[in-house]
Curated annotation (Swiss-Prot):
It holds the Pfam family Col_cuticle_N. Residues 1-28 form the signal peptide. The lineage of its organism: Eukaryota, Metazoa, Ecdysozoa, Nematoda, Chromadorea. Collagen polypeptide chains are complexed within the cuticle by disulfide bonds and other types of covalent cross-links. InterPro entries: Col_cuticle_N, Collagen. This is Cuticle collagen 39. Residues 80-89 have a biased composition (Polar residues). Residues 136-146, 169-191, 234-267 have a biased composition (Low complexity). GO terms for molecular function: structural constituent of cuticle. Residues 93-125, 138-200, 203-265 are annotated as: Triple-helical region. Residues 80-293 are annotated as: Disordered. Residues 108-117, 159-168, 224-233 have a biased composition (Gly residues).
Amino acid sequence: MTGPTCLAVVAGISGVFVFGALFSVAQIYNDISSFADNAHRELGEFKGFANDAWNSMVNHDDATRVARSVFVRRHKKHSQCNCGPQASNCPAGPPGPPGAPGDRGLDGQPGGAGNPGQPGVAGPKSHEQQECIKCPAGSPGPAGAPGAPGPQGPNGQPGHPGQGGSQGPAGPRGPAGDAGAPGQVGAPGNPGQAGRGGQRSHGLPGPSGAPGPQGPSGAPGQPGQSGGQGQQGPAGPAGPDGQPGQPGQDGQAGAPGNDGAPGADAAYCPCPSRSGSSSAVETGAAEQGYRHRAVAARHRNVIRRRVAKKRVVKKKRVVARQA
């Protein structure tokens, strides 16, 4: 294999690898863009679930306030309190979420009239004519750039005719002329005298003559019998591995997971025990709030599991393509 052929082969292989690298980069960029779009969409869904949970919690707080107001009114009617011991030295609970934005305020009243301004100052009665200030002349500026060439001038007057020159020296000898035409054929000569009788002898055979020209091609022969079918050759070696195939489509979303176990109680003070119908009202409101919180927590867990699963699938695809 010659040098140019080797160079062409190496250049072709390098071009194939470069094209494959560019294709891989484009695929990775496409996967990253798809992953970012999916993440934004899932974050939007999660935000919607969070807003729904927050609205349900706000509604629960309103219901709790109503229940508390009913309990307070009933508590004022009783002469005696059967409540348990009140808790003391309780740590402050975590700050609640920000409230909903309030309504826009009313426009302000128009302002009053401003105070009168200061009296103006009288100007001069007459203007004096002043002479202009004469400044000394400055130094001359630098030379300007050369101007454009002017137009072409008119043609000059024709000159006087020149005088005749003297005879020049003899030139060099020229080359020999061409050969002349061949002369005419001379007249035939007179016949010569008869020769004497020579001795006869047999000479040696002369050398072989040159081979003659090749004869014409003969007529085509009869077609021969067809040969039998040859035996099948051995199997060739296995070819190189092909390019990795296109990634498969995303599988269907899995079924939502089972409900999580209820969490442990937070670090809040224990509520005092109550008796009567007021405890039943607050117990029902507390159970309703717990259901809302459990539903919101279940939605958050489902979304987190989906996001984590999709991230693992994306990472596996990127690793498979790089390999």
